[in-house]
Amino acid sequence: MYSTELGINFFGNESNKKRQLNKIEILKKNIKNLKIFLIIAGTNTSQIPGISAAGINPKSRRTTALADAEFLLEGASKGHKYKLPLLNAGVTPALISHVCSKLINAYPVIVPLGIGVKPYFNHLVVEDRNLGPSNCLTTGKSMTKERVLNLYEKGLAIGKSLKQPVLISESVPGGTTTAQAVMEAFGLQVSNLVGSSLFKAPRELRRQVIKRGLLNAHFKADSDSFDVVAAVGDPFQAFSMGLLIGARLAKQPVILSGGSQMLAVILLVLEFLGEKNKDEFIEDVFIATTGWLVKDNSLNDLVNLINEKYDVKLLGLASPLNFKSSKYKELKDYELGHVKEGVGAGGISLLAFLDGFKNEEIVSLCQQNLEMMKGLGQISLEKDC
């Protein structure tokens, strides 16, 4: 991986330095004119014990995405409605995203899908909330194809209407598992490459869950991206496919802020496009993530696997943010491999660095917000919340 003077690491296709620097310039030029979407989605895959660190148990994972969205918008607040779930280690990456979005004066748009309740904060309504979470992928019937197509069409329409570059982020407990299922449905052997919010990825559990889902899906030879999402995917993937394609049709650059979940969306789009305009499509699409997620090189290998399969040149950028100097265990846990990414932490912190903010400034603000959220009782202390 190549590192710039800002400490930003590139991964994936690193064919020439000029292209890398052009990507940096695109980002820097658009920091103040960027539409940030946080897509919060529910899948009952998250209810499998041990599948996710986005909440200490299945019950707490039901409100994780809502709490993440609330914290992204409001930060530490006495009037908070949703408690952030207690984690085995670390703290929600929404902390990083909140701090950095405030630094760059960004106002994220929240898109709830399959959450089951109406958030009190401003949000974009794209489907009936009574639809609820998608089914567990083990059923092989995550959603109806009608729902998938509706989410795709809504995302497409929003994307095509955009007049500025886009950053797509997510909070989807269980979403890394549905991402892996989608990639394996298209023949990619990625079980050792897909990461996890957990310190140790539950690889064997995931293999069993995904194997069962793929068997129950009964795919046909002509099954397409929509069939795959309907079988083993989640609402985030369906909507983001449309949003990504729509934004590119509107000639807007797109930052996918995350890891394997964003790569699953890219794969779904590449399968859908086939050979049509894929090079033009991918040129101004790139992955942005945290340095913690690229530490072991698995994400780099995963990006290159997609590059090879689809003959594209997808490039990734990793934020230089680190918590080595922090005095708090919850932040230092990131350096040990806990949590790693989520809620757009990589992409939004990367933008803060490109806007001139220093690591120590971001760390200091994260510490202040952590102190406040703990003081206000914003993190649940219940292990069975």
UniProtKB/Swiss-Prot annotation:
A Pfam family annotated for this chain is DBI_PRT
GO MF, one example: nicotinate-nucleotide-dimethylbenzimidazole phosphoribosyltransferase activity
Instruction: Show the CDD domains listed in the entry.
Output: DMB-PRT_CobT
Q: Which InterPro entries match?
A: Nict_dMeBzImd_PRibTrfase, Nict_dMeBzImd_PRibTrfase_arc, Nict_dMeBzImd_PRibTrfase_sf
Q: Which domain of life is it from?
A: Bacteria
User: Which family, according to the similarity comment?
Assistant: Belongs to the UPF0284 family.
In its UniProt entry, what is this protein called? UPF0284 protein P9301_04631
Q: Which organism is it from?
A: Prochlorococcus marinus (strain MIT 9301)
What lineage is this protein's organism placed in? Bacteria, Bacillati, Cyanobacteriota, Cyanophyceae, Synechococcales
